Amino acid sequence: MRSGCGSVGAAPLPVAGSAVYTRSIETRPGFAVSLVSPRRSVGEQPAAPALASEWLIDAARIRASLVRVRRAVDRHAAYLTRLDAVLGDGDHGDNLSTGFRAVEELLAELPGETLPGELLRAIGHRLVATVGGASGPLYGTAFIEAGFRAGETTELDPPAIGEMLVAAAEGLARRGRCTLGDKTILGTLLPAATSFSHAVADGATGAAAARTAIAAARAGMQATRPLVARRGLALRLGEHSAGHLDPGAVSCLVILIALAGHD
C-alpha cells in the first residue's frame, strides 16, 4: 500500500515548568484537534499517587503486546488487503503481516535487559526495513518517535504513555506530510493520542484512558469512510475514494486494540 499521509504546521514549544502543554497538528477544515500531554521534570512524581502504581509498562509487557499485535494483524490481513485493493495496491495486510512477523523475530534477538525506549526504536527500524509501501516508514516512524519520547526509563506510567502517543502521531504526520482529514492512518492515531492524553491529564487511570482512546480511534477510523483521499494511490480515484474506509486507518485500530491488551 503506497499512501502518503500534506504538510503539518510547526508545533508551539511547551512552556517550561508547566504541568500540561498543548500542541496542534494542522488539520483540514472541520478537523481541529489539540494534543494535550502531561509534562514533568526529570524525577518528578505524578500528581495522582494512583498513577505511580497502576498500569506501569515495562519492556516485558511491550514485548508481549507486540506478539498480540502480530497475531491480530495476521487475523485481519485478508480484510486489510481487500480494503487496500479498492484504494491502493492490494497488499497492505500482507505487508503488515510480514513486518510484524519480522518484529517478533527481532524480539527474540534483543537482550532481555533492553530498555522500553530502545525496544520501541528497534521495532520502528525493523518495520521501516520490512514493510513494503509507505506504511512501513509511517508505522516505523511512529514507533521510533515513541521510543525517543520514552527516554531511558525502565517503566512507563500513563502520563509517559500519553506523551509517547502524541510523539508517535506527530512523527507520523511529519513523515507522511499528512493532516487530519486526509483519509490516512492519522485519522485513527491522532484521536487516540489526543483522547488518551486528555483522559490522563484529567486524572483517569491508564486502563480507563486506554478505553477512551480505543473508542476515539474507532470513531476516527469510521470517519475516514466519507472522506475524499488527499494522499497516496487513492488520490488518483478522486471523489470515487469516498465511501471506503482507509486501510491504514483500519490497521491502526487493529494495532492499537492489540497494544491495549486485547488479543
Annotated model-derived regions:
Residues 1-263:
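N-terminal loops that bind phosphate or other acidic moieties
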